[in-house]
């Protein structure tokens, strides 16, 4: 809810926004958003959409890759089309997608949960890709899955009883049970900034915008989008 005003400021007041009444993990959230598009915005069930997290640090090519995912979903060769990020090291933080081939677009053989570094090296040797939680589908597909797995009639009904829905991820509820699933490789820059540590590691400078640190500060980062400067004094390990 705290992001609604910022989204309207950036994209305009006419942008449709559906806000979760409470947290219920990614499957109910995606089902709610899908029902909003179909039942409220009256988007055709045959339309393809892309779901992506908001916190990765990416290059412009990433957004072209999102378009490619949607176009691949339009072909109806698979019910789900995932983005597989080319691994740059054997990470223990991400799940892995094991494809059937090293083609740019390939069928998915299986998924693997977050492994140890040694096991991750084995996955990468098999051509595995990071699962960044980015995928495309036709609206009707997820609407059917939502009605199959949850008891609701339409968007408003789902919204009203949302707090009673089981907490479950989209991967567990849908992706890992789907046989018609493809992955599209992405080799561009992609870094998950889901924590303050990873955000500050990606910053080339400790201050973005107008700000000053005195000599008593250590481990302090300032991100200031306002014209009013920020002065930090005697702070340690803080993001402002």
Residue spans of the language-model regions?
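Conserved N-terminal catalytic core of the sugar/cofactor nucleotidyltransferase
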Residues: 1-51, 57-64
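Short, well-ordered coil/turn elements that cap or connect secondary structure elements
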Residues: 11-13, 44, 75, 103, ...
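Fold-independent oxyanion-binding glycine-rich loops
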Residues: 21, 52-54, 84-87, 100, ...
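A short acidic, often aromatic-flanked loop/helix-cap motif at beta-alpha or helix-coil junctions
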Residues: 23-28, 88-91, 117-118, 190-192
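Residue-level signal for inorganic ion chemistry
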Residues: 33, 55, 97, 138, ...
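Conserved core of the sugar-phosphate nucleotidyltransferase
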Residues: 59-162, 182
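Left-handed beta-helix
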Residues: 137-240
């Amino acid at each position: 809810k705290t992001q609604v005003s910022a989204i309207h400021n950036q994209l305009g007041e006419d942008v449709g926004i559906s806000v979760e009444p409470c947290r219920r993990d990614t499957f109910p959230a995606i089902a709610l958003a899908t029902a909003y598009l179909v039942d409220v915005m009256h988007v055709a069930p045959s339309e393809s959409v892309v779901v992506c997290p908001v916190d990765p640090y990416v290059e412009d090519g990433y957004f072209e890759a999102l378009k490619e995912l949607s176009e691949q979903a339009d072909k109806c060769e698979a019910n789900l089309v995932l983005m597989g990020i080319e691994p740059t090291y054997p990470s223990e933080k991400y799940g892995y997608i094991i494809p059937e081939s090293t083609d740019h677009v390939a069928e998915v053989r299986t998924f693997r949960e977050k492994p140890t570094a040694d096991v991750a090296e084995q996955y990468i040797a098999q051509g595995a890709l990071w699962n960044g939680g980015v995928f495309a589908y036709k609206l009707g597909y997820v609407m059917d899955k939502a009605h199959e797995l949850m008891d609701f009639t339409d968007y408003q009904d789902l919204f009203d009883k949302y707090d009673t829905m089981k907490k479950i991820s989209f991967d567990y509820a849908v992706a890992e049970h789907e046989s018609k699933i493809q992955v599209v490789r992405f080799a561009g820059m992609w870094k998950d900034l889901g924590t303050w540590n990873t955000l500050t590691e990606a910053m080339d400078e400790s201050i973005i915008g107008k700000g000053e640190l005195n000599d008593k500060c250590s481990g302090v980062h300032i991100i200031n989008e306002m014209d009013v400067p920020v002065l930090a004094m005697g702070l340690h390990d803080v993001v402002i």
